């Protein structure tokens, strides 16, 4: 039987169905790292960015053997992608559900995403100027307004779409790569502090263990 711990982010309340389990309030990476060492299953009570932060710490610690249950208060982009419930149903399933390995999408910095990443124009720029590919398919070459990247539950693991007035069709693949004059990288709603000329999101060789 896996030992189960609860990671609660911010001032969120612990769902009643998780009562009796050890609870850790997480304010930063150090709090996540502390919990990783103690449990075989972690229940994340938070938002997509916080679930991604937990997966990032597991990835960097080489602890993708830890099962992860997601119990956000309400539905999110990640719950739709990975087809898991939210609220009370999610909390109940966190204790009783079985884990299965699903695709893990990360970037070159070792940061995971679970809902959506985006490439947006860099500082003082109106458009992205560059070129992006998904596997062997050219996503764009020239100027675009924005690019969004999402994990997919099915292989090959991710999909990307370009905005140029309207959002174009999705292109699926294992990796999305960009070379540009400068973009702002956004991961699950959190913008990087500095602009980047290159960025890559790709399917990690090993997935993460999602409790479903």
Please place each PLM-identified region on the residue numbering:
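Catalytic core of DAGKc-family lipid kinases
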Residues: 2-38, 45-188
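Extended, charged low-complexity segments
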Residues: 179-212
């Amino acid at each position: 039987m896996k030992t189960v711990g609860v990671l609660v982010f911010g001032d969120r309340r612990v769902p009643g169905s998780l009562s009796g389990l050890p609870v850790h309030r997480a304010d930063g990476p150090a709090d996540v790292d502390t919990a990783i060492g103690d449990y075989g299953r972690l229940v994340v009570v938070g938002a997509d960015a916080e679930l991604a932060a937990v997966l990032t710490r597991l990835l960097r610690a080489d602890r993708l053997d830890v099962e992860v249950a997601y119990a956000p208060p309400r539905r999110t982009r990640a719950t739709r992608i990975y087809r898991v419930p939210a609220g009370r149903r999610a909390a109940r399933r966190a204790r009783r559900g079985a884990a299965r390995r699903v695709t893990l999408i990360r970037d070159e910095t070792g940061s995971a995403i679970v809902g959506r990443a985006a490439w947006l124009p860099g500082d003082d720029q109106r458009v992205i100027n560059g070129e992006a590919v998904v596997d062997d398919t050219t996503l764009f070459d020239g100027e675009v307004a924005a690019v969004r990247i999402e994990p997919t539950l099915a292989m090959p693991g991710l999909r990307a779409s370009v905005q140029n007035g309207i959002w174009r069709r999705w292109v699926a693949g294992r990796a999305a790569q960009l070379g540009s004059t400068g973009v702002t990288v956004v991961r699950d709603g959190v913008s990087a502090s500095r602009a980047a000329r290159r960025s890559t999101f790709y399917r990690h060789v090993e997935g993460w263990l999602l409790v479903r």
